[in-house]
């Protein structure tokens, strides 16, 4: 299931340090069976290989998954989480969400 507003396979955020040129991301995204991708979640394609989300995983709304990330099977990723490029997460991973609060006068 891919919910509305999700963006899958966009170019990752990568630049060559000396020339400041954007790095071409020519890889892809693999999403396993029975996986849910929440609204307004972004999953960037890999530089060369694959960004991969394992089967039976649940990705909440407003999650950023960067290029070359590998997420195992049965993962649960809550809202507003950002996963940096080339991170490798194993099977049965679960995490909390990000929250922000500021005083209201």
Where does each model-flagged region fall?
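Structural signal for interior beta-strand "rungs" in well-ordered beta-sheet cores
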Residues: 1-105
């Amino acid at each position: 299931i891919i919910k509305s507003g999700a963006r899958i396979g966009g170019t990752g955020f990568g630049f060559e340090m000396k020339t400041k040129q954007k790095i071409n991301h020519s890889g892809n995204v693999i999403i396993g069976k029975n996986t849910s991708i929440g609204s307004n979640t972004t999953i960037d394609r890999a530089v060369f290989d694959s960004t991969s989300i394992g089967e039976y995983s649940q990705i909440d709304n407003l999650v950023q998954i960067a290029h070359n990330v590998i997420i195992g099977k049965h993962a649960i990723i809550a809202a507003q989480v950002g996963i940096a490029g080339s991170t490798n997460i194993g099977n049965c991973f679960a995490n909390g969400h990000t929250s922000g609060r500021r005083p209201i006068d």
